[in-house]
């Protein structure tokens, strides 16, 4: 489906900002292979608004916690045989009078807690309204030079009061697996001069292990090709990818919609895509 109107808030700082685009903006649901918004003109694509409203309703279809934990245990037994992993998601629903009154105000207030994230309030008639705050850049490409960067973001822990993270073996191992898989995919896509470094990245109340990965490509169509290669990320789906996606389709009872997909912003010099990692979906009236 295509949308005739797209309203959003975005930027590295929690404030309204206008982006004049000359190419396309699109969002893709998790593992769908379909771009929801694609080929829109700049005038069609962006509206910065302080009046977007949505009506929050009581949601009665949260994922049952007992069933969710049962599925997790069943999944562990299956993936242990292949030394892999599959990542199940769940839905937590609720009601917010503040959200029903003014979605924009709620989003801006939340974004104050995540100033280093990519923060966006997105609305289309087809998808409803989504509040997204993500630290994860799926892909950044300089279109003139072919320089690309991406990241592996797997290890997670609550941010300690002193800011000094002591990572356990599980987080370190999973970070290495995700990093190695991304680098393997980039090598398959003939990305050259691949290099990386690892650091800690704070995002709100949690801190992640983050491996920044860089390279160069000569392919003129590399941006879209690399998006298809990198998404869904191992941290959101699991590994090996084909097996993990099969297990997710078997065990999950709900569509992920935009969760775990990505949002892309392009202009004539740079193309960037961000994983819709942390997000909340309101109803689609607005």
Model-derived regions: residue spans:
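An N-terminal JmjN-like helical accessory module and its immediate linker preceding a catalytic domain
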Residues: 1-29
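An anion-binding catalytic pocket shared by soluble metabolic enzymes
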Residues: 2, 16, 90, 95-177, ...
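Structural signature of FAD isoalloxazine-binding scaffolds in flavoprotein oxidoreductases
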Residues: 32-46, 272-283
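Contiguous alpha-helical scaffold segments within structured protein domains
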Residues: 41-73, 95-96, 149-249
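Short coil/turn segments at secondary-structure boundaries
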Residues: 84-90, 121-124, 241, 259-260
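A glycine-rich phosphate-binding loop feature that marks nucleotide/adenosyl-phosphate handling sites
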Residues: 124-128, 183, 198-206, 262-267
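Glycine-rich, small/acidic residue-mixed loop/short-helix segments
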Residues: 237-243, 247-286
């Amino acid at each position: 489906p295509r949308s005739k109107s797209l309203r959003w808030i975005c930027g590295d700082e929690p404030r309204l900002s206008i982006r004049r685009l000359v190419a396309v903006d699109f969002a893709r649901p998790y593992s769908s292979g379909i771009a929801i918004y694609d080929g829109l003109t700049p005038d069609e694509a962006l509206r910065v608004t302080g009046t977007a409203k949505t009506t929050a309703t009581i949601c009665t279809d949260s994922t049952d916690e007992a069933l969710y934990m049962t599925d997790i245990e069943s999944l562990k037994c299956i993936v242990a045989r292949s030394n892999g992993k599959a990542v199940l998601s769940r839905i937590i629903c609720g009601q917010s009078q503040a959200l029903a009154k003014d979605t924009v105000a709620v989003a801006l207030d939340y974004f104050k807690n995540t100033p280093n994230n990519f923060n966006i309030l997105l609305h289309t008639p087809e998808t409803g309204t989504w509040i997204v705050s993500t630290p994860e850049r799926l892909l950044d490409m300089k279109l003139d030079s072919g320089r690309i960067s991406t990241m592996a973001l797997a290890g997670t822990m609550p941010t300690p009061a002193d800011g000094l993270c002591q990572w356990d073996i599980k987080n370190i191992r999973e970070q290495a697996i995700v990093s190695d898989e991304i680098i393997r995919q980039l090598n398959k896509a003939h990305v050259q001069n691949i290099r990386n470094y690892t650091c800690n990245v704070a995002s709100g109340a949690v801190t992640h292990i983050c491996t920044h990965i860089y390279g160069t490509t000569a392919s003129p169509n590399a941006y879209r090709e690399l998006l298809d290669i990198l998404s869904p990320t191992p941290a959101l789906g699991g590994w090996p990818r084909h097996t993990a996606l099969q297990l997710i389709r078997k065990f999950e009872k709900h569509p992920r919609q935009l969760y775990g997909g990505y949002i892309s912003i392009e202009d004539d010099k740079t193309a960037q895509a961000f994983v819709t990692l942390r997000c909340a979906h309101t109803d689609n009236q607005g």
